[in-house]
Amino acid sequence: MAMFLRWQPIGLGLGCFWLVAGALAAPAPHTHAAPTERPTWTRYPLLQAQATRGESAGGVRIDAANLPTPTLVMHTVARTDGQTLSGWRASREQTGSGHVWFSASGARDDHTVLRASTHVYLPGKPLSPSALLAQRRDGLEIVPQRLPEHGGVRETSQWRFQVRFNGQPRPNVGVELLTEPGTRRVWVSDARGEVEVTFPRDFPEAALAGPNRMNASQGFVLAVNQAIDGRNYLSTYAHRYYPDRMRERSLAAGVGALGFGMVLAAPLIRRKRERA
């Protein structure tokens, strides 16, 4: 059975860390935190938010996994102090427009403090998310330094994230990236508590089938596990990423090269037939 990862510095001057337990790639049963029950591809605490349609148009549905009896809090651009939600849906009146940040907290039987975070973008009046990202929140968390809007995160793109505890940067901390296809990479936060994450080019061909291949998406989670003041914390940030745009160009170039090759080969084929 796969175990959770723990990172501990082995020398503050060197900024090193070591791995206490094994990998977490094996699928895990979904906890009953959210009203819907879905399988998940990681044992890390996971929070996902999706804009809803229909009767609650413009609202957001939130799903949680691997979080025992979590408490859900929503932060918006207009209300950065946080609002505790009683359910797993947020109406458009609650969210407003722009970026909305969600975090869910809980605890394991071994008293490890768990937190999972994510965000969703809702179209509307453009508002800067800088105050939302800079807000001080208690506990251990991973925060992107900028939030994707229309383009989203894509394979091979680079994004910076910061590890914080009670709003303060945490240097020399191991940060693990795990993607839905199973890619795993690790970085160590710098003096500002930041890591620059390069997303892998790991979409399987099956996921790119169909006419809208560039709109395919897969999940990822960033995780940090650290003991602070005698207490263990495990926090994650999860979202989705999309195929590299170069895949589209590569396909077009391949089709073009094939067509050009056929044009060049046509006279040779014709001459061969005439000689025959």
Q: What residue spans do the PLM features occupy?
A:
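N-terminal pre-first-transmembrane soluble regions of secretory-pathway and organelle membrane proteins
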Residues: 1-107
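C-terminal single-pass membrane-anchor helix
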Residues: 2-10, 18, 239-276
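Beta-strand-rich domain onsets/edges
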Residues: 26-50, 116-171, 238, 243-246
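Short amphipathic beta-strand segments in non-cytosolic proteins
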Residues: 72-77, 143-147, 174-188
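Glycine-centered loop-to-beta-strand initiation motif
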Residues: 80-90, 94, 185-206
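Short, aromatic- and glycine-rich surface loops/edge beta-strands on solvent-exposed regions
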Residues: 86-121, 206-228
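Solvent-exposed strand-loop boundary residues in beta-sheet-rich modules
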Residues: 167, 179-181, 228-230
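Juxtamembrane amphipathic/hinge helix adjacent to a transmembrane helix
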Residues: 221-246
